[in-house]
């Protein structure tokens, strides 16, 4: 009797072990578990891709950001530098974001380039006129004159107004001390005068510290 009970216990233990193993094996291969695992992996990959795309887009946006420029800013700079083309002023203001900085760059002799994609209207007209003159064969001289006219009207070839002319225009004495003036207490004309004086002083300081600039003034 004892042998039969022991044998029955062994059989039940083996059967229970097999049943548990079979149950666990089925759970691992169950389609719902596989789908859930795949979904979580897919969601994780999608989130990573979205984050990477967002970072790349934000970096690209930062590179393309240009400071906003309105007509009032351009008008103020052009009143101080009337020989500058509005597109030159706009392009520089987009980089500096400051009227004062742009004026200082101009008065200190910095080059004020046009936007890379800018094409003056006179240049297109000059090229077409040159083609017509050459096709008639009657006028190499006329073609040259047209070229010279288009060059003189091309705003990129105009000589910039000198800083000394601005001193006269706004009645600014370089020897006068305006450092104690508060721009907030001044009128628009007085602010322009102060800006010219500040730019002149800044330029003088740069010339004093640069042998290259000193050589250009000799």
Swiss-Prot record:
Entry's localization field: Endoplasmic reticulum membrane
Pfam families given in the database record: CUE (PF02845), Cue1_U7BR (PF18499)
Gene3D superfamilies: 1.10.287.4310, DNA helicase RuvA subunit, C-terminal domain
GO cellular component, one term: endoplasmic reticulum membrane
InterPro entries per UniProt: CUE (IPR003892), Cue1_U7BR (IPR041158)
Topology class, membrane: Single-pass membrane protein
Residue ranges, Cytoplasmic side: 26-218
UniProt keyword terms in alphabetical order: Endoplasmic reticulum, Membrane, Transmembrane, Transmembrane helix, Ubl conjugation pathway
Disulfide bond residue pairs: none
GO molecular-function terms, A-Z: ubiquitin binding
Membrane keyword on record: yes
Lumenal face of the membrane: 1-4
Ranges of compositional bias, category Low complexity: 39-59, 121-153
Region (Disordered): 35-65, 105-160
TM stretches of this protein: 5-25
Domain CUE: 69-111
Classification via PROSITE patterns: CUE
CDD domains documented for this protein: CUE_Cue1p_like
Subunit structure: Forms a heterodimer with UBC7.
Function field: Component of the endoplasmic reticulum-associated protein degradation (ERAD) pathway. Recruits the soluble ubiquitin-conjugating enzyme UBC7 to the cytoplasmic face of the endoplasmic reticulum membrane where it functions in degradation of misfolded or regulated proteins localized in the endoplasmic reticulum (ER) lumen or membrane via the ubiquitin-proteasome system.
Record family assignment: Belongs to the CUE1 family.
The protein's name in its UniProt record: Coupling of ubiquitin conjugation to ER degradation protein 1
Encoding gene per record: CUE1
